[in-house]
């Protein structure tokens, strides 16, 4: 994120920074235990606040200004922003719906739904850690989407409760506590799911740098602050992946590897976003709003619910307020 370079180069630098922050967050698995849920929930709340503020000041505000200054929409300058915002949210929603068809089970809640309670995990389950990532039964209070992917329902089932007439399906055991072949497929699906949810963040950084100097509010400082903000919120996201994996029985190094892996897609999405807006400037309002809509949907659909389900809701809420204020200050004060 150095001035004087092309938009694509800036996007690449910015998204490498956000990936590095994801890896740094995942590295905390070497320090914290899987039982320290308050730290994770507070961090997720902070990340939610940062993303919401970044979505407005770094993406939606420039999009509205571009649509207005173009003069082609008149009183309907809100239209491209509204369309782009809705399409961004729809992209993540449809990605969620696609996951069950790839074999990820019935639950499309994939981004941060790794809420494992170590006190409820049996030793026998640790023979196949990956089977805990997509359990057939609930081991703790967590978010459960209905089949249409729209309605949340909190529920707490005993580890021995199963649907009427259904028998528990046995896990596929590997050797020495390592996941079996089908379990590795589940891990791959998990990483794919989290990666899909990281695309909007990388896209937002790329679009932000691609839009520099297109309007008064689309400045290098604004794009830089957006990258910093997304990097800040990526920090707890890395921990949100690695910590539950460690609690599920994976080695510390494997938990770290899978945690940082989720951020690898951001440089690719960032470069794509920068190229897109440089080559097709008229789509800028749509692109900025698309990135904002996708980010807001991830916050509302994944991060906030996940931070609320372990009894630390107030902490997460105040942390989100703090995150919003910090990101707002970065954009307004340093923009």
Curated annotation (Swiss-Prot):
Disulfide bonds: none annotated. InterPro entries: ZIP. It is found in: Cell membrane; Nucleus; Cytoplasm; Golgi apparatus. One of its GO terms (cellular component) is Golgi apparatus. Pfam families: Zip (PF02535). Keywords: Cell membrane, Cytoplasm, Golgi apparatus, Ion transport, Membrane, Nucleus, Transmembrane, Transmembrane helix, Transport, Zinc, Zinc transport. One of its GO terms (molecular function) is zinc ion transmembrane transporter activity. Coiled coil: none annotated. GO terms for biological process: zinc ion import across plasma membrane; zinc ion transmembrane transport. The chain crosses the membrane at residues 12-32, 44-64, 72-92, 187-207, 256-278, 283-300, 315-335. It catalyses: Zn(2+)(in) = Zn(2+)(out); Cu(2+)(in) = Cu(2+)(out). The keyword Hydrolase does not apply. It is a multi-pass membrane protein. The keyword Hydrolase does not apply. Zinc importer that regulates cytosolic zinc concentrations either via zinc influx from the extracellular compartment or efflux from intracellular organelles such as Golgi apparatus. May transport copper ions as well. The transport mechanism remains to be elucidated. Belongs to the ZIP transporter (TC 2.A.5) family. This is Zinc transporter ZIP11.
